[in-house]
Amino acid sequence: MKKINLAVVGATGMVGRTFLKVLEERQLPIENFYVMASSRSAGSKLTFNGKEYTVEELTEHSFDKPIDIALFSAGGGTSEKFAPIAAAHGCIVIDNSSQWRMDPEVPLVVPEVNPEDIAWHKNIIANPNCSTIQAIVALKPLDDKYKIKRVVYSTYQAVSGAGVAGWKDLENGLKGEAPKKFPHPIANNCLPHIDSFLDNGYTKEEMKMVNETRKILHNDNMRVTATTVRVPVFDCHSESINIEFEKPFEMDELLETLKNAPGVVLQNNSEANEYPLAVDAAGHDEVFIGRVRRDESVESGVNIWVVADNIRKGAATNAVQIAEEIVKNMQ
């Protein structure tokens, strides 16, 4: 692979630091490496591949130097302002915020699912929402084989999805302290409220899952609904997914399809109490699937339980995988 110049924007945040860890693990070939953040974090030090780097302040001139790929995880406002600047300088931006996801000019990519969409980028590629990424890895092989008619998501999302502040709310809440990030205590509680409420009664998080599922699977007519819930778990999102197919299926064949799907680990042995758990998925890049059973209330439906590390596969690793695909195709 060609060596590239790479920047991480939002390098001091939870996902930003995980970018560095995943880049080290996967050994993307890097010539020059830059870490950038807001003025608040500028001047701090980060270590990457055994070398210390000084965090630069992100400005309009940050991309005057040659940078091939920039991994952004600094929020929608930062991406809205700086991603077009980077793109105009010839840098390919892989953005982890929601800013560009539903832009028809911007590919929304999960490499195990739709890597071909990378080809039509205009120097900005969107990383999907964390809860969508793990779901789509599970849905894609089933959609290819049985044609999905309808999806019902129920999520159990870790506090790390709300960043360091969400993590601290749970940590401090277990000591009896009042929440600062969430509207109610998260310790010993479940909050059916992720992101803000919309006029249709759904939250933004729920509609992200609906709209992103359709875009990634290239099916605007797919019936999708979601209820997203924040739970008192530090890391890893869990999801109950009910899927209805257009075609009939045999359970043995469906299980084999999941077992052979890219990025999937099937843990489906109820007799041995084997099923995906957040504590086991933490630190891994795979999507874990279990509790697979026929939905007996419809003609052709299945229930599955899906767990993944939301900061790794749900954010940092997915973005780095996109970068790997880009580098493979560089001359």
PLM features per residue range, with description:
Residues M1-I186, M222-R223, V287-F288, V292-V298, ...:
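N-terminal Rossmann-like NAD(P) cofactor-binding subdomain of oxidoreductases
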Residues A70, V159-Q331:
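Charged docking surfaces used in two-component/phosphorelay signaling
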